[in-house]
Amino acid sequence: MTLHRTTVTKRLFALLASTSLIMTMGACSSANETQSHETDSPSTATATDAGNVVIFTPSDGITISQQTPLSKWEKLVPEIVSSLKDNDVKGANITVKAAPSLDKQSQSVQDYVVNHVNSTSDDADSSDKTTLVVAPVADTTESDRQYGDYVSHAITWNGSSSDEDAQDYAQSAERLVSALQLAQNEGMKVVLVSNTLQGFTPDVYVPMTTAEQIGQLQAKQLVSKLELDKTSSDNPKHIEVLLPYDAANESGSTADATFAQGVFKGIWSVLGPYFKDGKAVSPSGTLTSSSTESDWVSVAFDAAKSERVKSTLAGRLGMDKDTSRHTRIDGIISCNDYVAGYASEELNDLGYTGSAADINPSITISGIVDNITGKKDLKKQSVPDPAQAPESDDGDSDTEDTSDSLDEQNSQWPIITGYGAYVSSIPNIVNGKQWMTALENRKTLASDIAQTCVCLLYTSPSPRDRQKS
């Protein structure tokens, strides 16, 4: 069973520059090796001894940059535990184990399942039911980790590969699948979270945000803010896509491009029609009216270092050598907050001014009245774009005043989108330098997982019942 996809859509929400945010942030801690601990809480009259929940998650991914997203496993797991307790599962019946690699995780799951099966066989009176919650450790690149931990990956492998690293990975993955299949055969329930496993069908799959959804969300926000539906092909919007992608992983092998391709697929499913109709253009020419989702590589770049982000954007704008005149840019899809932050820095260094708040605001007379009476926020109506781009209007465009005026227009700050809700990105969102970010609703996600576990505990037969049957 898979939790319905709309559940993910409801959990995923965007934080916009115009939104008033109240956020509670917990202290951060790192987990660099396998950890196991039982969560203790006083027994209550309502708590149930109906079964155990064992949670296996990755240790938090470590990025080279100190900038990290809020969507970390170390923040989600306590929420799941808390939600399980709220659903009357005893703290003593909840176990959490974290591992930094698929190899370590597969061994941890295998050890638990084998030990549990042996102890159940030795204890004829055992009536414990067990649900395993497993978020398989994905082999991700640095650029993939920039999106945070709450994103879905399909874990696949080639068992016949001649590459030694690939063989080790396949062995770990197959060990995990075998352990989970043994668990199911012994009556345990398995809930897979976020990542799928090649050749394994869990009792329940809880999806998280996909790469395609990340791309779609940002593109839709950009289309809405720039009002592309009202844009004329004679005065198109100038848009760049900065797609982070590591061509090689940490071991030097060719990296899996699936995630980067998925992000661009989502972006292009929204922006493609506007480029085709001429309502959107790319200043760098990396995207054209004939581009397809297969052209993702044209906008991909290595974003492991901040200077690469900045130099790539300057190059796209043709300002890597000459910064005397600005290139018009209306929107930048940065894909994640790491890229968005350095894109904002570079635009500031290049002399772009203003903020996202200056683009298509909307204030009306009725809005002023409603604002005074407290019915709704004040919104400013935007001035319509001219039918033609300023540089194509009639008149003497060779004068110095006209040139300066055009450069002033071109230097206006663009819409910048991101993803991951980095703590470091919040100031940019507040001051309008970054238009939006997004993240999963952690509490809702934890509640979904906890309620699924409770349902499985109450509906699955106990080991004693299975022996009788």
Predicted regions and their residues:
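Bacterial lipoprotein signal-peptidase II cleavage site
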Residues: 28-36
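Extracytoplasmic "Venus flytrap"
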Residues: 42-83, 87, 93-120, 135-140, ...
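Hydrophobic alpha-helical segments within soluble ligand-binding/sensing domains
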Residues: 49, 173, 177-180, 206-238, ...
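Short, solvent-exposed amphipathic alpha-helices that sit
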Residues: 68-86, 104, 214-218, 255-286, ...
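Hydrophobic alpha-helical
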Residues: 131-150, 166-182, 294-409, 414-424
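Flexible loop/hinge segments that line or gate small-molecule binding clefts
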Residues: 149-166, 176-212, 244, 425-428
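Short beta-strand elements at the ligand-binding edges of bilobed clamshell
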Residues: 161-171, 198-224, 251-259, 431-443
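Conserved small/polar residues in nucleotide/adenosyl-binding loops
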Residues: 458-467
